[in-house]
Design a protein with these regions (language model features):
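Fe(II)/2-oxoglutarate oxygenase catalytic core
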Residues: 2-78, 85-315, 319-363
Length: 363
């Protein structure tokens, strides 16, 4: 039996492309608890900013905190990414617990908690003393070929991605709080997987909906193999009992349904999807490159966020949004942040779910 056939059979067993209709969660609706806060839509398609909200005082410690956090999660899932400024009184513990509660209050699996990154955790010298907080630093060099790595980053090569797609149960919500900013540059961009799906014709959508992809975190394994005395892979459960070992490989649908909104999103974007299992190697490469180029070439499905002050913070939904850092700050200082990543459900496609545009027309 060919390798392709074997992978396809595995995908049919593993990926819940079609399950009983009553097993699918119903989309969630906000209560309106956040409506009292001033906000700005960053673009028509993606992004929202609450310029005056203090997360600790106004949300975490509010009498109706659960209601507010649930509505915040729904808003993040609908808008893709949500921003807050200068959260100077937010601790790492509050930061990560807020990310976890976003998922809990929107019905993520009970055994899904917070992700422990395979490399960026407290077992390595660049981590903090907390496995559930990853330090994102411009000083971290995974690979020995610094000239090539720097050139790739300058060109923006392979930079759009969704967090930890290589896990059996990948991320739901991620939050990044920058603690140290360069003198200039270092913006982050997000792109809408909902809008990417919407921009294809119905025949293309149906084609994509029948596909699965193999996702791999092989880059982290290369880093470990290059410097085994320096990097170690965390092999214990990483936020879910199924996320174990050092294989860092999973099969997921190319199109998935976001359980919070009920909207379809392209999911196979970035460095982690390595192969579309039902296609030839050449066809797979062409499709993955085409999806990626759609993100790169359509600025109107993106939002760009300028980090203005330490402790600016972003929350996004990895199931339907992709992000990319801008590496344009060489010689302008260090860029450092603390990241917390929640673990969600195993990706699935509800064939009766709608696109974002279809759902908004019906609302």
């Amino acid at each position: 039996m060919s390798t392709t056939a074997t992978i396809t059979q595995q995908a049919e067993r593993i990926v819940p492309l079609n399950v009983e209709a009553n097993k699918y969660p119903k989309p969630l609706q906000p209560s309106g608890a956040l409506d009292k806060f001033t906000f700005e839509e960053s673009t028509p398609v993606i992004g929202r900013e609450y310029p005056k909200v203090n997360l600790v005082d106004d949300i975490i410690n509010a009498p109706n905190a659960d209601e507010l956090i649930r509505d915040l999660a729904i808003t993040i899932s609908q808008r893709g990414v949500v921003f807050f400024r200068a959260q100077d009184n937010l601790t790492d513990e509050q930061h990560k617990q807020l990310v976890h509660r976003l998922g809990e209050l929107t019905n993520k699996p009970k055994d899904s908690t917070l992700h422990i990154h395979p490399l960026l955790n407290s077992t390595n010298e660049f981590g903090v003393d907390d496995n559930e907080i990853s330090v994102i630093s411009s000083n971290v060099e995974f690979f020995q070929d610094r000239i090539k790595d720097r050139d790739d980053r300058k060109q923006g090569a392979a930079s759009w991605h969704s967090d930890i797609q290589f896990e059996q149960y990948p991320a739901d919500y991620t939050s990044l709080r920058l603690t140290k900013l360069p003198a200039g540059g270092g913006d982050t961009l997000w792109a809408s997987g909902y809008e990417l799906y919407d921009r294809y014709s119905d025949p293309y959508r149906k084609f994509f909906e029948g596909l699965t992809a193999t996702f791999s975190g092989e880059g982290f394994l290369r880093a470990r193999d290059a410097r085994p005395d320096h990097y170690k892979v965390y092999e214990e459960p990483r936020g879910n009992p199924a996320n174990i070992g050092d294989e860092l490989k999973a099969i997921h649908p190319v199109v998935r349904t976001n359980p919070v909104t009920g909207w379809k999103s392209i999911f196979a974007i970035g460095n982690f999807p390595k192969r579309i299992n039902e296609l030839s190697e050449r066809e797979s490469r062409e499709i993955l490159e085409s999806l990626y180029k759609r993100i790169e070439q359509n600025h109107d499905l993106q939002v760009r966020f300028r980090w203005r002050s330490p402790n600016d913070i972003a929350f996004w939904d990895n199931r339907s949004a992709f992000h990319s850092a801008t590496n344009d700050y060489d010689g302008l200082g260090e860029r450092t942040g603390h990241r917390a990543v929640g673990i969600g459900e195993k990706p699935y496609l509800d064939p009766n779910s709608l696109s974002r545009t279809e759902a908004l027309k019906r609302a």
